[in-house]
UniProtKB/Swiss-Prot annotation:
Gene: ilvB
GO molecular function: acetolactate synthase activity; flavin adenine dinucleotide binding; magnesium ion binding; thiamine pyrophosphate binding
Pathway of action: Amino-acid biosynthesis; L-isoleucine biosynthesis; L-isoleucine from 2-oxobutanoate: step 1/4; Amino-acid biosynthesis; L-valine biosynthesis; L-valine from pyruvate: step 1/4
Residues given in the record as Mg(2+) binding sites: 455, 482
Annotated region described as Thiamine pyrophosphate binding, given as residue ranges: 404-484
Keywords: Amino-acid biosynthesis, Branched-chain amino acid biosynthesis, FAD, Flavoprotein, Magnesium, Metal-binding, Thiamine pyrophosphate, Transferase
Name the record gives this protein: Probable acetolactate synthase large subunit
Length: 599
């Protein structure tokens, strides 16, 4: 067989089901081999969308997502999607075509230094120089992508290597690979675990901060056991949404810049903070000097580089969250059962829980607006009601784009199951929501997949309407349409003297006609009374469906200003954007005036 056929065999050996990609000249041997394979290839309309779809597939399923793009511009178009996966620790293998090995370094047609390009945004980079390397490199790539802290791995495929012959009997696909220098720690150090247990046992105001690492390790059941064993409140990061049902009485919601008041206040008042799979980003901590100043911090993370990077911790524990929590629960359970007298502090903890519950009750958000234009909170409320009415809570995946639509969902939507809320957290990539929904639906065909996006984010990858139309992928697209870059405008309004610049979409398309031009059902909703029925119609449809919600452009999110304390939550009240748009006639007038002045 040739190299390309060996690559297909290697993918099949990894039980890859689907590839998301876009072909090109440097990949023709690969696609020729793919033609003879049972592997499914989903042709996106842009390589960035292929990477986001592979990412959505990985987040929804826990499996490695695979994307592919040709050399040069195909590789550069993958970069944003791969960087998004890297920021959020999503397992991915990104394949790129490359010019023949003898032409590398000669500035050949569509040549680019793909290794240098991907190096900062992947766990590891490979370039296959000989066909005999194919089996081991592919096995190594998948091993690296899904072990330790997951993330993307890049393999560069020169065209001549795809065409050369390989004796697969002499170079079989290995079942295991030895990766020198790569040995992720999974078992927590016993001494550190004992220190953590001692701190937890002495706590009077304990709280858990659960991040994306809980979901990545599959530790949601262990987290729930720990929460209920100790009766400890829990808040999550954006990436941790879904690791515990947000309807649980001890769940406080998301913490941070756009976090809930109970989460932000309780974390700030805690005396022991148990952080699990969280990297303490600036969006979580706010002013680092005022972050959890009363608390002793226990930090559990599989990546030792994250511990102590942003926040000083008292008890660091490196390892897999699931395995560490199992051991913590085992030892705490033993202590509690052995001597209940040691639990005399329970009254103090119960007072803490009483205070937490009181804060939750006083912080219930108003969502039932009947205003026109529609308030985003009303859409979120009706979406949760429809999901309840249809009894699909455990069978629904939400993807979001980035901006106000993302934070309205993160703040107000009650996520109940793991891997059911997919969003770009670390990189904050606009354009992520729609293609990631495609990947999620392919990964979980029996689930209802609903993409929540803004008009700005949707337009960044709206060409993928062609993908869902061609393959009849029944995702529901909900556009929060305010004809504005809402989050940018909110910041300009709050922190830049209300000076509006480049935030209005005066030339946005008619999204209904755009969808219908692809043969996709679509509907515009302008009244709150239409929301419930429209959502049910779209969710029950077995075809793609686009809903365009005309939302109030003056709607804004409460937030913690950048660099402020978590308890410094401000209400954002703003007017309708009224930016003056400079039209082409004005651009031309200035050009001609400058031209005359130069004479």
């Amino acid at each position: 067989m040739n190299g390309a056929e060996a690559m297909i065999k290697a993918l099949e050996a990894e039980k890859v089901e689907i590839l998301f990609g876009y072909p090109g000249g440097a990949l023709l041997p690969f696609y020729d081999a793919l033609h003879h394979s049972d592997l499914i290839h989903l042709l996106t309309r842009h390589e960035q969308a292929a990477a986001h779809a592979a990412d959505g597939y990985a987040r929804a399923s826990g499996k490695v997502g695979v994307c592919i793009g040709t050399s040069g511009p195909g590789a550069t178009n993958l970069v944003t999607g791969v960087a998004t996966a890297h920021s959020d620790s999503s397992p991915m293998v990104a394949l790129t075509g490359q010019v023949p090995t003898k032409l590398i370094g000669n500035d050949a047609f569509q040549e680019i230094d793909a290794l240098g390009l991907f190096m900062p945004i992947v766990k590891h980079n490979f370039q296959i120089q000989k066909t005999c390397q194919i089996p081991e490199i592919f096995r190594s790539a998948f091993e690296i992508a899904q072990t330790g802290r997951p993330g993307p791995v890049h393999i560069d495929l020169p065209k001549d290597v795809q065409e050369l012959e390989l004796d697969i009997d002499k170079h079989p696909i290995p079942s295991k690979v030895k990766l020198i220098g790569y040995n992720p720690t999974t078992i927590g150090h016993p001494r550190q675990i004992k220190k953590a247990i001692k701190l937890i046992a002495s706590a009077k105001r304990p709280i858990i901060l659960a991040g994306g690492g809980v979901l990545l390790s599959g530790a949601n059941e262990e987290l729930l056991k720990l929460v209920e064993l100790l009766n400890i409140p829990v808040c999550t990061t954006l990436m941790g949404k879904g690791c515990i049902s947000e309807n649980h009485p001890l769940a406080l919601g998301m913490v941070g810049m756009h976090g809930t008041k109970p989460a932000n206040y309780c974390l700030s008042e805690s005396d022991v903070l148990i952080s699990i799979g969280c990297r303490f980003s600036d969006r979580i901590t706010g002013d680092i000097k005022s972050f959890a100043t009363n608390a002793k911090i226990i930090h559990i993370d599989i990546d030792p580089a994250e511990i102590g990077k942003n926040v000083n911790v008292d008890v660091p524990i490196v390892g897999d969250a699931k395995l560490i929590l199992k051991e913590v629960i085992k030892q705490l359970d033993y202590i509690i059962n052995k001597d209940s007298k040691e639990n005399n502090d329970k009254e103090n903890i119960s007072q803490w829980i009483e205070n937490v519950n009181s804060l939750k009750k006083s912080s219930i958000p108003v969502m039932d607006y009947d205003d026109i234009p529609i308030k985003p909170q009303k859409i979120v409320k009706e979406l949760m009601a429809v999901i309840d009415d249809l009894n699909i809570n455990k069978n629904t995946i939400i993807t979001t784009d980035v901006g106000q639509n993302q934070m309205w969902m993160a703040h107000y939507f009650k996520t109940q199951t793991p891997r059911s809320f997919l969003s770009s957290g670390g990189l904050g990539t606009m354009g992520f929501g729609f293609p990631s929904a495609i990947g999620a639906k392919v990964a979980k065909p029996d689930s209802k997949v609903i993409c929540i996006t803004g008009d700005g984010g949707f337009m960044m990858n709206c060409q993928e309407l062609g993908t869902i139309a061609e393959y009849n992928i029944p995702v529901v697209i909900c556009i929060f349409d305010n004809r504005t870059l809402g989050m940018v405008y909110q910041w300009q309004n709050l922190f830049y003297g209300k000076r509006q610049c480049s935030v209005n979409f005066g030339g946005a398309p008619d999204f209904i006609k755009l969808a219908e031009s692809y043969g996709i059902k679509a509907r515009r909703i302008e009244s709150p009374n239409e929301i419930n029925e429209a959502l049910k119609e779209a969710i029950n449809c077995d075809e793609p469906y686009l809903l365009d919600f005309a939302i109030d452009p003056s709607s804004a999110l409460s937030m913690v200003p950048p660099g402020a304390k978590l308890t410094n939550i401000i209400d954002a009240v703003q007017e309708h954007p009224n930016e003056k748009i400079v039209c082409f006639d004005e651009i031309k007038r200035r050009y001609m005036e400058n031209k005359r002045n130069r004479k």
